[in-house]
Amino acid sequence: GGKDSTVLLTLVWLALRKIKRDTITPFQLRRSIYVMCNDTMVENPIIATYVDEVLAQIETKAREEDLPIFVRKTEPKLEDSFWVNVIGKGYPVPNTAFRWCTDKMKIKPTARFIIEQVDECGEAIILIGTRKAESATRARSIKKHEVYGKRLTNHTILRNTYVYAPIKELMLEEV
């Protein structure tokens, strides 16, 4: 992920370490925490290899520290993949006016994973590394979905799924 996702993961990691250190029987460490990565399958091979190495390091370090952090990589279904849509179906290359790839290659695969978790655990909480200061569009989106006085908001589509944006108020200089 980018800098915001990295900051979010770091904060979660530090919080889990603190819980483990300060609590005799840390019941908070019983639930699995998944670091999600969307593999669009069109990334430069050098970048893809680097991402795989970073994800492996996250998983290894989590096991060393006995933290319930697990890495999961999602991929689009074949019919939603970039090349099937561009070459096979004749879609234009994604642009600002027609961003079909975000839904097919990132949102749908992640949603499938979340639905599996909800089916297994009853609910899911998504921690998302978005900030109001990223852009006016991002600020509007956050404002539209936040509920004053509530940390968790209902996911707009997925049942029993909640969203938490703990770094939404941070400025660029703070990340």
Placement of each model-derived feature along the sequence:
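Conserved G/P- and acidic residue-centered "switch" motifs that form tight phosphate/ATP-binding loops
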Residues: 2
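Nucleotide-activated chemistry modules centered on ATP-dependent adenylation/adenylyltransferase
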Residues: 5-175
